Amino acid sequence: MAKGKDVRVKVILECTGCVRKSVNKGSRGVSRYITQKNRHNTPSRLELRKFCPYCYKHTIHGEIKK
């Protein structure tokens, strides 16, 4: 049986707070996490609350394109 595209794909989550601050040069860097998601169960963009070491708090990390 032929396998199609993989169901589980790696996604990169980026801090939305740091992205806004980096435009104004108020941040030292951008926090990124690498995780996996199941495309069949979660077809939309993934957003999780993760700890950002640059903001020093839990912020929303959104999925970005590779």
UniProtKB/Swiss-Prot annotation:
Q: Which PROSITE patterns match?
A: RIBOSOMAL_L33
- Any one Gene Ontology BP term: translation
Tell me the Pfam families matching this sequence.
Answer: Ribosomal_L33
The terms describing its cellular component in GO are:
chloroplast; ribonucleoprotein complex; ribosome
Q: What is its main location?
A: plastid
Does the record bear Kinase in its keywords?
A: no
Q: Where in the cell is it found?
A: Plastid, Chloroplast
- InterPro entries of this UniProt entry? Ribosomal_bL33, Ribosomal_bL33_CS, Ribosomal_bL33_sf, Ribosomal_zn-bd
Q: Which GO terms describe its molecular function?
A: structural constituent of ribosome
Q: Which UniProt keywords apply?
A: Chloroplast, Plastid, Ribonucleoprotein, Ribosomal protein
Q: Ribosomal protein: present as a keyword of the record?
A: yes
Q: Which HAMAP family does the protein's record reference?
A: Ribosomal_bL33
- Subunit architecture: Component of the chloroplast large ribosomal subunit (LSU). Mature 70S chloroplast ribosomes of higher plants consist of a small (30S) and a large (50S) subunit. The 30S small subunit contains 1 molecule of ribosomal RNA (16S rRNA) and 24 different proteins. The 50S large subunit contains 3 rRNA molecules (23S, 5S and 4.5S rRNA) and 33 different proteins.
Family per UniProt? Belongs to the bacterial ribosomal protein bL33 family.
Described by its record, this protein's role is as follows:
Component of the chloroplast ribosome (chloro-ribosome), a dedicated translation machinery responsible for the synthesis of chloroplast genome-encoded proteins, including proteins of the transcription and translation machinery and components of the photosynthetic apparatus.
This chain belongs to the protein called: Large ribosomal subunit protein bL33c
Instruction: Give the lineage.
Output: Eukaryota, Viridiplantae, Streptophyta, Embryophyta, Tracheophyta
